[in-house]
Every structure is written in structure tokens, then in C-alpha cells.
Amino acid sequence: MDIISLGWVFLMVFFSFSLSLVVWARNGL
């Protein structure tokens, strides 16, 4: 696995995590 694909995986995981966190916060936890 090269650094480019590793960065993409990290970016996708971070994006999905932040998105789910925003939705979770809007639902009032």
C-alpha cells in the first residue's frame, strides 16, 4: 500500500466519522 492510497483511506474514514458525528449531535445524542 503506497502513501496515496493510505491517505485516501484515512480521508474517507475521517470524513465518514465526522459526518456521523454531526448527524448524531443533531439527533440530540
Swiss-Prot record:
It is found in: Plastid, Chloroplast thylakoid membrane. GO terms for cellular component: chloroplast thylakoid membrane; cytochrome b6f complex. SUPFAM superfamilies: PetN subunit of the cytochrome b6f complex (SSF103451). Its main location: plastid. One of its GO terms (biological process) is photosynthesis. It is a single-pass membrane protein. InterPro entries: Cytochr_b6-f_cplx_su8_sf (IPR036143), Cytochrome_b6-f_cplx_su8 (IPR005497). The keyword Chloroplast applies. GO terms for molecular function: electron transporter, transferring electrons within cytochrome b6/f complex of photosystem II activity. Keywords: Chloroplast, Electron transport, Membrane, Photosynthesis, Plastid, Thylakoid, Transmembrane, Transmembrane helix, Transport. Disulfide bonds: none annotated. It comes from the Eukaryota. The chain crosses the membrane at residues 3-23. The 4 large subunits of the cytochrome b6-f complex are cytochrome b6, subunit IV (17 kDa polypeptide, PetD), cytochrome f and the Rieske protein, while the 4 small subunits are PetG, PetL, PetM and PetN. The complex functions as a dimer. Component of the cytochrome b6-f complex, which mediates electron transfer between photosystem II (PSII) and photosystem I (PSI), cyclic electron flow around PSI, and state transitions. Belongs to the PetN family. This is Cytochrome b6-f complex subunit 8. It comes from Mesostigma viride.
